[in-house]
Amino acid sequence: HCRNRETFLKFDRKIFFCHIPKTAGTSLRLSLEQAVGDAAVVPSQALISHHGGRYPPLHEALQELQEKPDYRLFRGHYGFWVRRYLPTDTLTIAVLREPVERILSHIRHFLADGRITEADAFESLDQGRLPIPDNTMCRYLGGTPIKAEGQELSDRFLAYRFDPIDDHDSLFKRAVSTGRSVDIMGFTDEMPDLYEKISQETGLPLTMRQDNPSRYPELSLSDRQLDTVRRHNQLDLQLYEAM
């Protein structure tokens, strides 16, 4: 680990981990936090605790960035475009997951949180609707900067997850080109490779972990319900293929 430590001491770029929900990102996030040390992370654990264990609204996270200029790691469920608030040489990391698996995990997350009931979820799918945001990976990578500040910025970013996509083609193209610009892109089913890449690049001693597994049992969907999931996530399916 000594050699790694020396590399990290020389590695003076900040790190932005764009944490797309339900991509096994929590395990990576905790490994990164452990490696850089809690004091060097934004949003801070205190701010996250203040929000009941969730990432804080975007404007509060950005406010903390201003207050902690010596941070090493910025991470959260924030769109990739947020990197415009970070130094230009920031090392960027993102993780993609097979889209149908990611959606099922996301639905289970909403069920575990009590945000929807299983009856509602299945009824939505039976009616051809998705009970959670669609094409989340494309939205995170291909979303455009929101020109607002303070609470309005956070509100609009949250609303954007559910807003109808007005131009599928341009969102997809932006997501692909952004995806290709990410310094270190990982995949949920190849996590050891990702840890290896990050360690080599940064010298951080990362430890593989298994965190935040779903607190809700596996879902068993009918073919028709799975078709609904696929139909509503065409962009993410294409993005995953393209990467």
Feature map (PLM): residue ranges:
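PAPS-dependent sulfotransferase catalytic domain
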Residues: 49-95, 101-207
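A residue-level signal for conserved active-site and pocket-lining positions in enzyme catalytic cores
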Residues: 24, 98, 186, 198, ...
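A generic structural motif
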Residues: 42-49, 103, 208-218
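Conserved aromatic-histidine-acidic binding/catalytic patches
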Residues: 16-20, 91, 182-190, 224-231
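PAPS-dependent sulfotransferase catalytic core
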Residues: 2-70, 75-80, 106, 112-114, 189, ...
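Short beta-strand/turn micro-motifs composed of small residues
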Residues: 19, 96-97
